[in-house]
Amino acid sequence: MILALFCIFLVSAFFAIFEDKLSSFKWVIYALVGVCLVLLAGFRPVGIDNDSINYELYFFKYDNPLFENTVEPSFRFISGFLYKNFKDVHSIFIVYALFGVSLKLIAFRKLTQHTYLALSIYICTYYILHELTQIRIGISSGLLLLAIVEICNERRKNACGLFLIALLFHYSSIMLFPILFMSNKDFSFKEKYFWSGLVIAGYGFYFLHIGLATLPIPYIADKLQTYEELKQEGFIDEVNVFNIVFLVKIVIFYYIMYFYDIIKKQNNYLSLMMKMESISLFSFTALSTLPVLSFRVSELFGIVEIILYTNILYTIRPNLFGKIISLTIGFILMFIAIYYNKLIQL
């Protein structure tokens, strides 16, 4: 499994380095890499990741009333159809991988000129997290990337429609709707400081022990309090706000913000993406007392990292060196995800 993933990454990285010199034939390879990613996620052994055992349970018990409030209707409906026809959990892995991977590959072509570089970063980061683990949110994150294009081109109704579809696949997608009111206008001097300061403010919430569970909001406060109790009883892991991956993300965020004026000439969606990344980093620390919410918000908004990390090449000359640095960062993050965070069982 890991060897296959590494080989696909090497193929993508090779084409990323020489993408500028390739003909239209590169899109055939691009599609074939996508097919390989779908098959790898679709036929992975149950138990090799952290969530597939639960998905197998949801699949075979799709009509169990206990799951009505915790599993989205779309997952139960698709599971019911596939169970009756195939009775194999891999069928739903394939369906979700097909949508999750395809949506992202389409989005990469819209969001960046360096599609293979984005593909390589994706393989190293969110492919492992979403298509191999959190398959429901994998579709939502793909729809989010497509919605960025719609929002930045003032087609907010289209973006709203995409968010509504995303909500069918994962309830946490409800957090995406505030993005509809965000602007993609160039940052002013004050705005740069605000969005940069928001990341630091997250640590302020962490050190001051400010928790959302104390907010007097009916139902939500009760739900958050339940998460807090589960954490105290040891059923939910603590959030390490000083883990190496998160610190690297912060460094890259400030690096890109420093070179904002250079990068924005190449990335028409930079302002909105940086706002989303700032929210992602802020949420991870500010919501750390509620690990489930902390990870959900941070990982969903953080999908823009795939494009942002490719933007590093615009700040380095020659571009080849910039691509190598971006690929190296991606490979290191993949190594940490597999061997340190153990997102894939060896």
Regions found by a protein language model. Name each.
Residues K26-Y30, Q266-E277, F321-S326:
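Membrane-interfacial loop-to-transmembrane alpha-helix junctions, especially the N-terminal start
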Residues I53-L57, Y62, E72, R76, ...:
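Alpha-helical transmembrane segments and terminal signal-anchor/GPI-anchor hydrophobic tails
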Residues L105-T125:
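Transmembrane-helix signature of polytopic, membrane-embedded enzymes
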Residues A16-A97, I336-L346:
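TM-lumen/periplasm interface segments of multi-pass membrane proteins
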Residues L144-N158:
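Membrane-interface transmembrane helices that cradle and orient dolichyl/undecaprenyl
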Residues Y127, N158-M182:
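Membrane-interface alpha helices of multi-pass inner-membrane proteins
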Residues S196-I200, P318-A337:
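Signature aromatic-anchored transmembrane alpha helix within multi-pass, membrane-resident enzymes
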Residues L132-G138:
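Short acidic/glycine- and proline-prone juxtamembrane loop motifs at membrane-interface regions
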